[in-house]
Regions:
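Acidic/glycine-enriched connector segments
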Residues: 1-130
C-alpha cells in the first residue's frame, strides 16, 4: 500500500504533561479539545483525506489516532503508525495506547535503532507524505 500524499493527513502535537489536564481526558477542557480535534478530522475526511499518519506518541498523536479508529468503524479510513524506531514507547503500560498501535493498519519504523535524530526523521517522514 503506497501512501498518497494528496489523500493523507498527519498528526503530531503536545504530550499529556504539557496540558493542564495531563492524561485526564475526562476533564472539561480536554473534552473540548478532543471535540475540536474530531471536528478537524471530520473536515479532513470531508476534504477527501482517507489516510492518517500519527507518530505514536502519547497525547495528541494517540488521541487523534483513537478518533480515527472510532470513525474507521463506519468509514473507509487507513491509520498508519509512523514510529521513530523499533520499541518506541515500549515502556508505556496504558492499555488504550497499546491497543491503538495494534489496531493501526500499518506500523512503520523510520530508523532501525534508537537515536535522538529518529524523532525528527519520523516527523519529516510524515510531513513529506501528507
Amino acid at each position: 500500500m503506497d501512501i498518497q500524499p494528496e489523500k493523507t493527513c498527519c498528526f503530531t502535537g503536545h504530550r499529556p504533561q504539557f496540558f493542564p489536564w495531563g492524561s485526564n481526558t475526562g476533564d472539561p477542557a480536554a473534552a473540548k479539545m478532543l471535540r475540536a480535534l474530531e471536528s478537524e478530522i471530520l473536515q479532513a475526511i470531508a476534504d477527501s483525506y482517507t489516510t492518517f499518519l500519527y507518530g505514536g506518541a502519547l497525547g495528541v498523536d494517540a488521541w487523534a489516532a483513537e478518533i480515527v479508529l472510532r470513525l474507521r468503524k463506519n468509514l473507509p479510513l487507513t491509520l498508519i503508525a509512523i514510529l521513530p524506531f523499533p520499541g518506541y514507547n515500549a515502556d508505556v503500560t496504558e492499555n488504550s495506547y497499546r491497543q491503538t498501535i495494534a489496531a493501526s493498519d500499518r506500523i512503520l519504523c523510520v530508523e532501525p535503532v534508537r537515536r535522538m535524530a529518529a524523532l525528527a526523521a519520523r516527523d519529516r517522514y510524515m510531513i513529506d507524505r501528507s
